[in-house]
Curated annotation (Swiss-Prot):
Its main location: cytoplasm. Gene3D superfamilies: 3.40.50.2020. PROSITE patterns: PUR_PYR_PR_TRANSFER. It comes from the Bacteria. PANTHER family: ADENINE PHOSPHORIBOSYLTRANSFERASE (PTHR11776), PHOSPHORIBOSYLTRANSFERASE DOMAIN-CONTAINING PROTEIN (PTHR11776:SF7). Homodimer. One of its GO terms (molecular function) is adenine phosphoribosyltransferase activity. One of its GO terms (cellular component) is cytosol. It comes from Sodalis glossinidius (strain morsitans). It catalyses: AMP + diphosphate = 5-phospho-alpha-D-ribose 1-diphosphate + adenine. GO terms for biological process: adenine salvage; AMP salvage; purine ribonucleoside salvage. Its EC number is 2.4.2.7. Pathway: Purine metabolism; AMP biosynthesis via salvage pathway; AMP from adenine: step 1/1. This is Adenine phosphoribosyltransferase.
Length: 183
């Protein structure tokens, strides 16, 4: 087993599965258990950063809230700035917003209007790719400000929920450390 394979195994083993959370029939993949394991957390940051080290990026964007936990250290590892995307009303300067559809309604995200400049090459980082709605809204915000997004990076991909297909449909390739193909 290579060093990278060992790191990926450690990361996957550190993610606890919680049955029937947040509702019956759901098998929740708990990334907070990965955060509790310093070796697994460090490995996840190192692998994500290494994957995009030579990609010519200028900014890392992370979505509230767990995207901050992975996006910020990846940005630091790459020597780049980090831009948070937050729920409405949480950012102090002038923002733009994007609404997106949830299973039972809609939600919204905001980004500072001056955080991305035309031509910025942006990597979106989040803990988990599920349906892709949050990340698509994030990509729309970045593109509205003139940023270029070709990739999004995740610790976990719940492939059975179709997020990767949705991202591909808007021209964004996804990279994940750990794939969970089914419930």
């Amino acid at each position: 087993m290579t060093a990278t394979e060992q790191q990926l195994a450690l990361i996957k083993q550190s993610i606890k599965s919680v049955p029937d959370y947040p509702k019956p029939g759901i098998l929740f993949r708990d990334v907070t258990s990965l955060l509790e394991n310093s070796r697994a957390y460090a490995a996840s940051i190192a692998l994500l950063a290494d994957r995009f080290r030579d990609a010519g990026l200028t900014k890392i964007v992370g979505t509230e809230a767990r995207g901050f936990l992975f996006g910020t250290p990846v940005a630091l590892a790459l020597g780049l700035g980090f831009v948070p995307v937050r729920k409405p009303g949480k950012l102090p300067r002038e923002t733009i917003s994007e609404n997106y559809v949830l299973e039972y309604g809609t939600d919204g995200l905001e980004i500072h209007k001056d955080a991305i400049v035309p031509g910025d090459k942006v990597l979106v980082v989040d803990d988990l790719l599920a349906t892709g709605g949050t990340i698509c809204a994030t990509v729309k915000l970045i593109r509205r400000l003139g940023g270029e997004v070709q990739d999004a990076a995740f610790v976990i991909n719940l492939a059975y929920l179709g997020g990767e297909t949705l991202l591909n449909s808007i021209g964004v390739a996804s990279y994940s450390l750990v794939l969970f193909p089914g419930h």
